């Protein structure tokens, strides 16, 4: 756990974010739109595009109460609150990311629709049957106990609630290219195959609506020469150290078949 907390540490994140906003000509003293922050606050494979595609699959409506699991800087939560007007609760383990999320919620004027909670996805501070939908992007790779994770998500969903996710799944061979965006070394990378995800979710009381492998689609879209933003620009490098190396290793892992990118929607029985 200590190594995982260090991996997701982003000291002085508020100052970093404010400096990056000003560097690209955005005024943090005026209300910003979630769209202006899209390159910064979607810390998962595919970024904002992946969030929009998952939103379409999830079929979330304005009246829904939504849970964002492992929310990071809460970019998807702001997207939901802004586009649909729904209420979103975020659960995030990193105190630095919680601070950054709260700052960006204030800067976009969405703090009344989004609540940020620091805590673990394995023991969430919510009552049973609280949410109409839950979303999770590139989070389960850090959690070894998938059964407890899925059981806890099911607990907080209402009957018939929808769980939409994007994750890296295990490929045909072990992962060898480190550091990765989700783990500095193998001790914090807990990948399982897409088939095992489906099986454990079923055992935990979920029904499959869809589960698809989007690895090749992602590789074709991004291109081998795609480069992350540099420090001082508005992008993930504002708060993710060694982003170029981590992103490059993630691409190599996909190309080598060591990991697969999957997304799915499951319904609570």
Each model region followed by its residue ranges:
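Short, glycine-/aromatic-enriched active-site segment of Class I SAM-dependent methyltransferases
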Residues: 168-188
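A short SAM/SAH-binding and catalytic strip from SAM-dependent methyltransferases
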Residues: 133-145
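Conserved Class I S-adenosyl-L-methionine
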Residues: 212-269
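Conserved alpha-helix/loop element of class I SAM-dependent methyltransferases that forms part
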Residues: 27, 44-62
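A short glycine-rich, Lys/Arg-flanked "PGG" loop and its adjoining helix->strand segment in the class I
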Residues: 147-162
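Class I SAM-dependent methyltransferase SAM/SAH-binding core
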Residues: 65-69, 73-123
């Amino acid at each position: 756990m200590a190594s995982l907390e260090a991996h997701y540490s982003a000291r002085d994140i508020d100052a970093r974010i404010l400096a990056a906003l000003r560097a690209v000509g955005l005024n943090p003293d005026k209300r910003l739109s979630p769209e202006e922050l899209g390159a910064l606050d979607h810390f998962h494979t595919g970024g904002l595009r992946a969030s929009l595609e998952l939103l379409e699959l999830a079929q979330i409506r304005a009246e829904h109460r939504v849970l964002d699991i492992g929310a990071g800087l809460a970019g998807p939560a702001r997207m939901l609150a802004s586009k649909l007007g729904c209420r979103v609760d975020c659960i995030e383990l990193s105190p630095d990311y919680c601070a950054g999320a709260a700052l960006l919620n204030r800067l976009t004027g969405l703090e009344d629709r989004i609540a940020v909670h620091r805590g673990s996805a394995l023991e969430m501070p919510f009552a049973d049957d609280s949410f109409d939908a839950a979303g999770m992007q590139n989070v389960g790779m850090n959690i070894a106990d998938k059964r407890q994770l899925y059981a806890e998500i099911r607990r907080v969903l209402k009957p018939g609630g929808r769980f939409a996710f994007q994750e890296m799944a295990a490929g045909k061979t072990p992962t060898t290219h480190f550091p990765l965006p989700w783990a500095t070394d193998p001790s914090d990378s807990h990948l399982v195959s897409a088939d095992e995800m489906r099986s454990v979710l079923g055992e935990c009381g979920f029904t499959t609506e869809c589960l698809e492998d989007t690895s090749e689609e992602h590789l074709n879209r991004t291109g081998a020469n795609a480069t992350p933003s540099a420090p001082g620009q508005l992008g993930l490098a504002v708060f993710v150290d060694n982003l170029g190396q981590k992103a490059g290793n993630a691409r190599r892992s996909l190309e080598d078949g060591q990991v697969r990118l999957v997304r799915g929607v499951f319904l609570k029985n």
